Amino acid sequence: MNSKIELNVELDENRVPEKLTWSAQDGGIQNEEAKAMMLSVWDSNTQETLRIDLWTKDMPVDEMKQFFHQTLVTMSDTFMRATQDEKMTATMKDFCDYFAEKLELKKN
């Protein structure tokens, strides 16, 4: 069985993203618009992370700060599920709290 996630990027004449959409047919998502995306892929052969970080030119800075904070929080959750390392997860969560405090982000 295969599952497919599709990312589409519309660029302006300077190759700057104007519109980002994504689809995941298995999840019932079709051409859902996004203002930012981060994709990380582990290359086991070279032992390095390959990344694609995209955001539209109209992405507000305050939303970008929230996006980064929420990404850091979910990365710490994923780290815990993948490693069961409670001590490092707590350290990562502390950093997330510090990050939010310094950016004066309100917790929802």
Q: Over which residues does each language-model region extend?
A:
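Short, acidic, Ser/Thr-enriched surface-loop or helix-capping motifs
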Residues: 11-12
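Active-site- and interface-proximal helix/loop "cap" or "latch" segments in soluble metabolic
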Residues: 18-84
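C-terminal charged interaction modules
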Residues: 77-108
